[in-house]
């Protein structure tokens, strides 16, 4: 099933099409609850480390899709949550107490930062599986791989803001 997901991702993301200077593409994949998912991310990076996420292509095989629109919403939400964590999610603990208390000191991704997201649900006769958390985990490594592809700089830890990259 993962092989099929990756083949469709290659096609839908136009993986073989070159990107211009300062642009990069990266992928990440995982199996969650027996269901494979893969994501391709395209970024544009300035010399100072400012970057935009231009496009996310997500392909998943979650078995029989009972509610495709609900699945798309879950996947888009998971991607948004994962992007915020990857870009600037940081929790400070002092004397056993979390210092962040709300969105004023724990930033989340904002609408202008959210990329175009394409969700491709593969037709399947397999039993349906969960998709609630499926899209969150692979997005950070896919972005890191895209940044590496664009800049040659490996990301070794998150958030990206701690590595000199700023999502704008």
Positions of PLM-derived features:
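Cofactor-binding beta-sheet edge motifs in enzyme active sites
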Residues: 1-168
């Amino acid at each position: 099933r993962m092989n099929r997901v990756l083949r469709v991702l290659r096609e839908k993301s136009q993986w073989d099409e070159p990107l211009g200077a300062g642009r990069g593409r990266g992928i990440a994949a995982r199996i969650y609850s027996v269901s494979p998912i893969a994501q391709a991310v395209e970024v544009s990076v300035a010399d100072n480390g400012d970057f935009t996420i231009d496009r996310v292509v997500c392909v998943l095989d979650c078995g029989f899709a009972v509610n495709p629109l609900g699945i798309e919403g879950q996947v888009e939400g998971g991607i948004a949550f994962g992007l915020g964590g990857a870009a600037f999610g940081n929790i400070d603990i002092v004397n056993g107490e979390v210092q962040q208390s709300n969105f004023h000191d724990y930033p989340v991704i904002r609408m202008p930062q959210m990329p175009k997201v394409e969700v491709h649900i593969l037709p399947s006769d397999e039993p349906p599986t969960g998709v609630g958390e499926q899209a969150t985990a692979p997005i950070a490594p896919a972005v890191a791989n895209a940044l590496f592809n664009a800049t040659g700089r490996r990301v070794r830890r998150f958030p990206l803001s701690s590595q000199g990259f700023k999502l704008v």
